[in-house]
């Protein structure tokens, strides 16, 4: 493990993070010690720790060392897809799409059998297209990824379940709640029956299912699902995580739906603080998720008759939406602007 220690210390990685990288190699019985692979592994560790900028830096170092020695082609794709995913996490969507497309082009031009790397890139583009409101493009890419995974693994596989999950999220945004719920339930069934130890996947799917259930007016079931997801997440995470923030926000929407505004306000504020804790680790102080919480807090104050507090939060939200939203038709963004104009 000396080569890992020396390599990472040489680029300024702190001792505690080097230890985590070494632990990852040991847990996975990984004996590939070329520079590209080491930096890719370090990037994964920083990503898991919520440090997106440091993760991006490690992926860039991995890519920069591609032609300095021996490397596996999979490490090339991993580093480029990794850079793309970090740019995506940091909100630099155009750069992310270029990176994802470069992976797709190489794989297709060379007729390579790197289906997992191809699917990862397709999913990345689909996700960004969804964020931008390009729903037809998102649906096309998700279905392409689903077709590849079904051919590779069959329907009842974790990789297929992941794509079904994303399709559920897309159909939710398209207000096709029946399809959304069907996809979430199918995904959840696969996870629970085939992969019961995949707690994050289970909890994540439950939280998204709750969102669609509330849209159908099933507030009691939605509240139950959101709380179930938080209970599972709390078994996994010891630090603030955006998945927990999402479920807290979801509980806020249930109480808002019920006109229980004091409870809604409490949950939206909890969600806001959790999101802030998450994104500040990557020095990201403005984010769409934070803006959405600010908007919801402003909305609840307005519904409660507190116009002064409402205006303060709505103005903060609007400013952040303007600097972070890539979809001008986003529902929260448009609603926030309308309240301020009225």
Curated annotation (Swiss-Prot):
InterPro entries linked to this entry: Apc5_dom (IPR026000), TPR-like_helical_dom_sf (IPR011990), TPR_rpt (IPR019734)
SUPFAM superfamilies linked: TPR-like (SSF48452)
Species of origin: Acanthamoeba polyphaga mimivirus
Positions of TPR repeats: 36-69, 77-110, 119-152, 161-194, 203-236, 245-278, 291-324
Coiled coil: none
Signal sequence, start to end: none
Keywords assigned by UniProt, alphabetized: Repeat, TPR repeat
Protein's UniProt keywords contain 4Fe-4S: no
Lineage: Viruses, Varidnaviria, Bamfordvirae, Nucleocytoviricota, Megaviricetes
Gene3D superfamilies: Tetratricopeptide repeat domain
Protein name from the UniProt record: Putative TPR repeat-containing protein R856
The UniProt record lists the keyword Repeat: yes
């Amino acid at each position: 493990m000396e080569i890992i220690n020396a390599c990472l210390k040489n680029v300024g990685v702190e001792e505690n993070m080097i230890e985590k990288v070494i632990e990852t190699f040991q847990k996975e019985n990984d004996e590939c010690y070329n520079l590209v692979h080491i930096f890719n592994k370090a990037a994964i560790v920083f990503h898991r720790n919520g440090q997106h900028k440091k993760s991006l830096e490690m992926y860039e170092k991995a890519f920069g060392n591609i032609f300095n020695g021996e490397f596996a082609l999979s490490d090339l794709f991993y580093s480029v897809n990794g850079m793309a995913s970090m740019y995506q996490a940091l909100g630099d969507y155009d750069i992310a799409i270029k990176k994802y497309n470069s992976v797709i082009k190489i794989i297709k031009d060379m007729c390579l059998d790197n289906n997992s790397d191809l699917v990862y890139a397709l999913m990345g583009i689909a996700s960004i297209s969804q964020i931008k409101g390009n729903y037809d493009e998102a649906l096309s890419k998700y279905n392409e990824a689903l077709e590849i995974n079904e051919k590779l693994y069959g329907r009842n596989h974790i990789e297929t379940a992941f794509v079904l999950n994303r399709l559920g999220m897309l159909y939710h945004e398209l207000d096709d709640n029946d399809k959304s719920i069907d996809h979430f339930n199918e995904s959840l069934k696969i996870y629970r029956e085939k992969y019961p130890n995949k707690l994050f996947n289970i909890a994540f799917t439950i939280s998204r299912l709750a969102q669609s259930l509330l849209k159908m007016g099933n507030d009691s079931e939605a509240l139950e699902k959101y709380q179930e997801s938080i209970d599972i997440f709390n078994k996994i995470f010891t630090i603030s995580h955006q998945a927990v923030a999402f479920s807290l926000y979801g509980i806020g929407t249930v109480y808002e739906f019920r006109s229980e505004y004091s409870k809604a306000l409490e949950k939206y504020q909890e969600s806001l603080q959790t999101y802030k804790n998450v994104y500040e680790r990557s020095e990201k102080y403005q984010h769409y998720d934070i803006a959405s919480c600010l908007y919801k807090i402003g909305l609840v104050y307005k519904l409660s008759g507190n116009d002064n507090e409402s205006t303060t939060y709505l103005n903060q939200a609007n400013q952040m939406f303007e600097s972070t939203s890539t979809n001008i038709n986003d529902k929260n963004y448009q609603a926030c602007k309308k309240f301020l104009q009225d």
